[in-house]
Amino acid sequence: MRRYWVVIAVVTLGATGFLLRQAHQAHADSTSTGPSTTSSSTSTSMVTTTTLYRPAAVCVRVCSPWRVMDPWLHAVPSVLTTSFVPFPATPSVVAYAAWIRTSSTDLSLYPGYKGPGPTAAGVDRGPMMVPASGRPRLLATFNSGFYEADGAAGFYVNHTLYFPMVDGLATVVRYTNGRVDIIRWTGAARPGANIVMARQNLPLLVNASKPTPLSADNAAWGLTLGGVPAVWRTALGIDAQGNLIYAAAPSQTAASMAVVMTRLHVVRAMQLDINPEWPIFVTYGASGAIGATLFVPNPNQIPGRFLYSSTKDFFAVYASRRPGEAQPW
């Protein structure tokens, strides 16, 4: 595990201080403090050590380490990826996972020109792509959930309620304080003032770090191409430290996809889109959305998918400047 150090030094007589930090990362990171104080007639100094949280390698018979995808940012590593074989009995089936540090990123949601479904005349659907204003700090983009016609679900972003929230459904939310979570929705049809983004899709797939009982009912998790039970599936989870984990894998039932997410140590997870056409996770090699690369090797997708007008809604991950800031629009 790589360690990053934050050092605070205070010199009393010299009236000099300095602080080296990465903005607002600490609330989701594990820390250990070991103060060391030395005294003399001239100065006093205190050193505080902080260990930055990194996810452990994914180990299923063999261990698969995480790879940093945003070294060009020259800041806290915020998007890491790995691939692994979730079930040793089927070694040809590989799962692709991305870990997103929520304390140093902004998770944003964008409508496409078809999804979410038809809305009232005059409703602002936004840029329907990654806007130019956000591209200098764009780190990743990935697919969202079902069309509303395929599963009624709430959709809220940029102070606009495109579809009302549905009680009991799995919901990814971003709050005004910058925190992100995946929850079972128990609120009103319209999110409260402390929520800046909310997207629902079906019930929870994983809860309390275990597959939910409903995950065993494959018919409850969407129509599959050709009616086969095991298809490409994607999911989004939250770990115990409050960081997001996206995963995509072929040949999965709802139940096996839930197991994939538990192998990634999520506390809760929701299924996103399914079937071969939709899985996509893109990383970027430089500021300005340069060097777009498909992390999930889907021949039905292209790296620049969300840099142009998109049919379906999608998520974008930006390097954060301050907690809870409005997403680029």
What are these regions (language model features)?
Residues 38, 44-45:
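Duplex nucleic acid-engaging cores and interfaces of nucleic-acid transaction enzymes
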Residues 183, 207-208, 222-329:
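Extended C-terminal subregions enriched in glycine
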Residues 110-263:
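Aspartyl protease catalytic domain
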Residues 86-92, 176, 240, 309:
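Short, ordered beta-strand-loop transition motifs
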